[in-house]
Amino acid sequence: ILASVGVVAYNGYTTSAQRSAAASNHNSVVKWIQNEYQKCSIGEKTAMNANLTCVDDADLPADAAAVAAATIKSQQATTAKMNNPYTKTAAVQNTGTAVPTICSTTNRGQIVITTDSDNVVVTTCQAAKDGDTTNLLSDTIALN
Protein backbone atom coordinates (compact mmCIF):
# COMPACT_ATOMS: atom_id res chain seq x y z
CA ILE A 1 0.00 0.00 0.00
CA LEU A 2 2.78 2.42 0.88
CA ALA A 3 4.49 1.69 -2.43
CA SER A 4 1.41 2.69 -4.42
CA VAL A 5 1.07 5.90 -2.41
CA GLY A 6 4.72 6.65 -3.13
CA VAL A 7 4.25 6.16 -6.88
CA VAL A 8 1.26 8.52 -6.96
CA ALA A 9 3.15 11.14 -4.95
CA TYR A 10 6.23 10.79 -7.18
CA ASN A 11 4.16 11.15 -10.36
CA GLY A 12 2.51 14.26 -8.96
CA TYR A 13 5.91 15.70 -8.07
CA THR A 14 7.41 15.06 -11.52
CA THR A 15 4.36 16.51 -13.28
CA SER A 16 4.59 19.64 -11.16
CA ALA A 17 8.34 19.90 -11.77
CA GLN A 18 7.90 19.54 -15.54
CA ARG A 19 5.22 22.23 -15.60
CA SER A 20 7.42 24.58 -13.56
CA ALA A 21 10.42 23.87 -15.80
CA ALA A 22 8.39 24.64 -18.94
CA ALA A 23 7.23 27.95 -17.45
CA SER A 24 10.80 28.76 -16.39
CA ASN A 25 12.09 27.99 -19.90
CA HIS A 26 9.42 30.27 -21.37
CA ASN A 27 10.30 33.14 -19.04
CA SER A 28 14.02 32.65 -19.68
CA VAL A 29 13.55 32.91 -23.44
CA VAL A 30 11.41 36.06 -23.09
CA LYS A 31 13.99 37.74 -20.84
CA TRP A 32 16.85 36.60 -23.05
CA ILE A 33 15.24 38.14 -26.15
CA GLN A 34 14.64 41.42 -24.31
CA ASN A 35 18.19 41.55 -22.94
CA GLU A 36 19.87 40.57 -26.18
CA TYR A 37 17.82 43.07 -28.17
CA GLN A 38 18.94 45.82 -25.79
CA LYS A 39 22.53 45.16 -26.86
CA CYS A 40 21.60 46.59 -30.24
CA SER A 41 20.25 49.78 -28.67
CA ILE A 42 23.53 50.44 -26.85
CA GLY A 43 25.66 50.16 -29.96
CA GLU A 44 26.72 46.52 -30.12
CA LYS A 45 27.28 45.21 -33.64
CA THR A 46 25.76 41.79 -33.02
CA ALA A 47 23.55 40.06 -30.46
CA MET A 48 22.07 36.63 -29.80
CA ASN A 49 25.38 34.79 -30.03
CA ALA A 50 26.22 36.72 -33.22
CA ASN A 51 23.06 35.42 -34.94
CA LEU A 52 21.53 38.91 -35.06
CA THR A 53 23.27 41.77 -36.83
CA CYS A 54 22.32 45.01 -35.11
CA VAL A 55 21.13 47.93 -37.20
CA ASP A 56 21.90 51.58 -36.54
CA ASP A 57 19.96 52.95 -33.59
CA ALA A 58 18.06 55.29 -35.91
CA ASP A 59 16.71 52.26 -37.76
CA LEU A 60 15.35 50.47 -34.70
CA PRO A 61 13.32 48.36 -34.43
CA ALA A 62 15.10 45.58 -36.21
CA ASP A 63 13.07 43.31 -38.41
CA ALA A 64 11.01 41.15 -36.04
CA ALA A 65 11.47 38.15 -38.33
CA ALA A 66 15.26 38.53 -38.06
CA VAL A 67 15.04 38.69 -34.27
CA ALA A 68 12.80 35.61 -34.17
CA ALA A 69 15.09 33.66 -36.52
CA ALA A 70 18.19 34.65 -34.52
CA THR A 71 16.49 33.57 -31.30
CA ILE A 72 15.55 30.19 -32.72
CA LYS A 73 19.05 29.61 -34.11
CA SER A 74 20.71 30.64 -30.85
CA GLN A 75 18.40 28.60 -28.64
CA GLN A 76 18.74 25.47 -30.79
CA ALA A 77 22.54 25.56 -30.76
CA THR A 78 24.16 22.59 -29.07
CA THR A 79 25.48 24.97 -26.42
CA ALA A 80 22.00 26.31 -25.55
CA LYS A 81 21.22 23.47 -23.14
CA MET A 82 17.52 24.34 -22.84
CA ASN A 83 15.47 21.20 -23.25
CA ASN A 84 11.78 20.48 -23.22
CA PRO A 85 11.16 19.03 -19.74
CA TYR A 86 8.70 16.49 -21.13
CA THR A 87 10.63 15.12 -24.13
CA LYS A 88 14.24 16.11 -23.35
CA THR A 89 14.56 17.50 -26.89
CA ALA A 90 15.14 21.14 -27.85
CA ALA A 91 12.53 23.35 -26.20
CA VAL A 92 12.55 26.06 -28.89
CA GLN A 93 10.87 24.84 -32.06
CA ASN A 94 11.89 25.36 -35.68
CA THR A 95 10.58 28.22 -37.77
CA GLY A 96 7.18 27.33 -39.20
CA THR A 97 5.94 25.39 -36.18
CA ALA A 98 2.27 26.19 -35.69
CA VAL A 99 1.50 28.42 -32.72
CA PRO A 100 -0.45 26.37 -30.20
CA THR A 101 -3.93 27.60 -29.40
CA ILE A 102 -4.61 24.79 -26.94
CA CYS A 103 -2.31 22.48 -24.98
CA SER A 104 -1.93 18.82 -25.83
CA THR A 105 0.42 15.96 -25.10
CA THR A 106 2.13 16.62 -28.44
CA ASN A 107 3.01 20.29 -27.81
CA ARG A 108 3.64 20.39 -24.07
CA GLY A 109 6.92 22.07 -23.17
CA GLN A 110 7.46 23.42 -26.68
CA ILE A 111 8.42 27.08 -27.13
CA VAL A 112 7.20 28.59 -30.39
CA ILE A 113 8.60 31.95 -31.51
CA THR A 114 6.70 33.95 -34.12
CA THR A 115 6.26 37.55 -35.21
CA ASP A 116 3.39 39.98 -35.30
CA SER A 117 4.27 43.24 -37.03
CA ASP A 118 7.17 44.74 -35.02
CA ASN A 119 6.72 42.24 -32.20
CA VAL A 120 8.19 38.87 -31.33
CA VAL A 121 5.66 36.49 -29.76
CA VAL A 122 6.77 33.63 -27.50
CA THR A 123 4.16 30.92 -26.85
CA THR A 124 4.58 27.85 -24.65
CA CYS A 125 2.30 25.06 -23.50
CA GLN A 126 3.46 24.47 -19.95
CA ALA A 127 1.36 21.40 -19.12
CA ALA A 128 -0.03 18.33 -20.80
CA LYS A 129 -3.78 18.44 -20.28
CA ASP A 130 -5.40 18.02 -23.70
CA GLY A 131 -7.61 20.84 -24.92
CA ASP A 132 -6.59 23.20 -22.14
CA THR A 133 -5.97 26.90 -22.77
CA THR A 134 -5.18 27.80 -19.16
CA ASN A 135 -1.76 26.15 -19.41
CA LEU A 136 -0.82 28.24 -22.43
CA LEU A 137 1.73 31.01 -21.85
CA SER A 138 2.17 33.83 -24.37
CA ASP A 139 4.32 36.95 -24.21
CA THR A 140 4.61 39.67 -26.82
CA ILE A 141 7.91 41.54 -26.97
CA ALA A 142 7.60 44.94 -28.61
CA LEU A 143 10.66 45.89 -30.63
CA ASN A 144 9.76 49.55 -30.97
Which sequence ranges carry the predicted segments?
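Amphipathic alpha-helical segments typified by the pilin-like N-terminal helix
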Residues: 1-28
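A general marker of short, structured functional hotspots
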Residues: 6-9, 33, 82
